[in-house]
Amino acid sequence: MDKDELKEIIKNLPDNSPKILEYLKLAKEKGWKDIVNMIAQKLGLEEEEKKKTDETDVLKKILKPLGKGKIKGTWDYSVDFVEAKKTLVSAYKQLYDTNLMPYEAYVAILLIQLVNGCRIREAIRAFKTFIESGEREFQLQAQKHGNIRFMIIPDVVKKKATYNAVLTIDDEKLSARIRMFALHYLKANTHSLRYALISYLAKNGIDPAIIAKITGHKRLDRIITYTQTKDAIEMLRKLAD
């Protein structure tokens, strides 16, 4: 079968024909890109691809990289708390207006993580608790060590019927998706949002014991070591300028 013959067959083939996938495989093997596109259009795949491209363009416009570069030996991408909060709040409002799911929920969860200084799985559980109960302030069991920690849902985050779909996604799968989303669009890992709050509070003179209580750290020395390391790195950068 030559290329022109296959084109004629596809033109007259019903959209639901089982043969169409067989012809798609043949066109790919032969390297006939125009026929592959022709079949994709017939199957509606072309529209799906265009939708994904449009979504990517929207996300790139409203989200900006927050990571300033990974600090060697740590998980920290040097995210500024104030800048991150401004970016995520603005992005959430715009996504809320366009109803761009699931990214709207991803940004809401990242914002919850940022303002609570929590782990991504804790932010996911907090978001799900909010969707189910409507409560904005509640206690959750921390991901590590099982400590009980207080969580707050920012006022900007609203309840929406479309968010119920998030309740059906396993926490581990959802956290993996959000981690990929953050790395792609924010150029930072999700844990950097937790570090951003710690740095912000330390710079504002908050007692390490209070910071540990806010962020759910069991060991105070972890907070002290991290803040001292960050201060030392910033001092070296200033000296090098």
Curated annotation (Swiss-Prot):
GO terms for biological process: DNA integration; DNA recombination; establishment of integrated proviral latency; symbiont entry into host cell; viral genome integration into host DNA. Keywords: DNA integration, DNA recombination, Viral genome integration, Virus entry into host cell. One of its GO terms (molecular function) is DNA binding. The active site is at residues 119, 144, 191, 194, 217, 226. InterPro entries: DNA_brk_join_enz, Integrase-like_cat_sf, Integrase_catalytic. Signal peptide: none annotated. The keyword Membrane does not apply. Belongs to the 'phage' integrase family. This protein may encode an integrase, which is necessary for integration of the viral DNA into host genome. This is Putative integrase ORF241. It comes from Acidianus two-tailed virus.
